[in-house]
Structures are given as C-alpha cells and as structure tokens.
Amino acid sequence: MISRHLQNNLMSVDPASSQAMELSDVTLIEGVGNEVMVVAGVVVLILALVLAWLSTYVADSGSNQLLGAIVSAGDTSVLHLGHVDHLVAGQGNPEPTELPHPSEGNDEKAEEAGEGRGDSTGEAGAGGGVEPSLEHLLDIQGLPKRQAGAGSSSPEAPLRSEDSTCLPPSPGLITVRLKFLNDTEELAVARPEDTVGALKSKYFPGQESQMKLIYQGRLLQDPARTLRSLNITDNCVIHCHRSPPGSAVPGPSASLAPSATEPPSLGVNVGSLMVPVFVVLLGVVWYFRINYRQFFTAPATVSLVGVTVFFSFLVFGMYGR
C-alpha cells in the first residue's frame, strides 16, 4: 500500500516538473541560447558607445581645424594691412639723405647730395605709384593718408567727403542730417527760420515735388512751416524718400478730392459679392426647408435659424452705420 501511494505521488509530480523543464528550455531565438543573446547584446552596446565617442571626437577635431584656418586667415590679413601701412608711411616720410663724411671734398658732397635727392624723389614717386593699386586691390577706403613733410611735392586739392567732419556752423545755424532709404546721410546747414520748401529747394533743386520729408514719424507736407515750428533743432535726423517721377507729394487738399492720375479699377471686387451670394444661399436653403421639411431634422432647423439671425445682425452692423 505504501509503495503504491508513493508511486501515485511520483506520477502526480512528474507533469509539473516536466512543464517547468519545458519553460526553462524556451529561448528567444530557436537554436540559440539565451546566454549567447545576452553576450551579443552587450557587445553591440559597447560598439555603439565606441562609435558615438569616435564621431564626437572627429567633430571636435574638425571644428578645431576650421578655427585654425580662420585664425590663420585673420593673421594673413593683418600682415597685408601692415605691409600697406608701411608703404604709406614710406610715401609720407621719405628717407633722409645720408650725411657725407667730413673728410670728403666739396665736389663729392655736391654729387652725393644730388644723388640723395634723386633717390628720395624716386622712392616717393614709387610709393605714390604703388599705393593707388594696392588701395584698388584691397579696397582700403578708411585708411587715413598721412600728409607729406614741409619740403614734399605741391599741395593737393582737398577731396570732398560726406563722412568727413564738418566745420562747426556759424551762430544761428543748425545742422540737419538728411537720411535716405539706403542708409546714406547728407548734412544740411539751415536756419531755424527756414521753411520746409526752402530746405527742399536748396538741397533737392528740381525735385521738390518728388521728395518726402519725414520727421519723427510725421510727414512734413506744408512747405510754409518753419523748422523752428516743427521743433527741428541741431543734429536732428529727417528721413527723405524720393517718389517716382510720375507721382507727386500729396498736399493737404489731396485727401479731399480723388487723384486725377489714378487709373480706374477694371477688376471686380470679390469681397462685395460675398454678401449677395450668401443671401441667395440662405434663401435656397429656406425654400427647401419649407417645401421639403421631411428632410430637415430639428437640430438642422435650429442651426439654420441661428445662422440666419447671426448673418442678419452682421449685415445690419456693416451697412447700418
């Protein structure tokens, strides 16, 4: 009896143990153990980290190379500018003539002095011939030109420049900056009693009808107004706008009458047709609602009434003013 009971217990335990063994034998990929999959995953993760580090390292080296190239380019430009500055200095300050030895004769002194003058004149001429070409190649416009010494060549005519420093105006005069749309400026000297029309005639002769002057966001339309009445003081900025030749500056009475040069509009205004079209659509929908009411549910009827009321208020608000 005991042996049979033990045998029955063993028979009842065997199916559970067999199921546990079957579950333990299940793998992610058939034919490949789970340990192999874990090792392969770890290797792939390490490779991904190494590749990410290498890519970051390469990007840093590339940026360093680019920074080095920019720095080297900046150094070369500084060297070129230094060379030009040296040439300009050589032109402005010619080399002094060597003093002859006191033991030499008077004839040798005269010859050496003549040769020294010729060499200095040749060097100054060579410097004057090289400088314009270098300025043309390097486009150096803001480089200050050094004046020659007292014994140099004949005086040159002064160049007129808008950006140069102007002399202080006489007492009673003010300086007004006329600024255009292309960010260029022109200095205008006027009296506070001068009018806007006089300012236009002085600095824009023949273009008074095309020029528009704007000060502090206000268009200066009245040519009889003085600068003092417009609170235009010294060093104020007036924006200038040049209109096309066909158009003129609108006067105070231009807004009362339509312009004669404005061409008539031949196109159809679509916005004005929206209200009639919507009225026709509402009329058609209401016609179908009255004659075929079986096709309209209660929510549809309520929505139609609401749209009609809203549209009526909108139309009365637009045309009832």
Swiss-Prot record:
Region labeled Disordered — which residues? 87-131, 145-170
Residues forming the Ubiquitin-like domain are 174-247
How the protein sits in the membrane?
Multi-pass membrane protein
At the top level of its lineage, which domain of life is listed? Eukaryota
Which Pfam families does the entry mention? ubiquitin
Q: List the SMART domains hit by this protein, alphabetically.
A: UBQ
Give yes or no: UniProt keyword Transmembrane helix. Answer: yes
**Record has Transmembrane helix as a keyword:** yes
Renumbered to this chain, the Basic and acidic residues biased-composition regions fall at 104-120
Main location group? membrane
Q: Where in the cell is it found?
A: Membrane
Sorted alphabetically, which keywords does the UniProt record give?
Answer: Membrane, Transmembrane, Transmembrane helix
Q: Where are the transmembrane segments?
A: 36-56, 266-286, 295-315
A GO cellular component annotation in the UniProt record? membrane
Biological process GO terms, please?
ERAD pathway
Indicate what this protein is called per its UniProt record: Transmembrane and ubiquitin-like domain-containing protein 2
Which organism does this record belong to? Answer: Homo sapiens
Query: Gene name?
Result: TMUB2
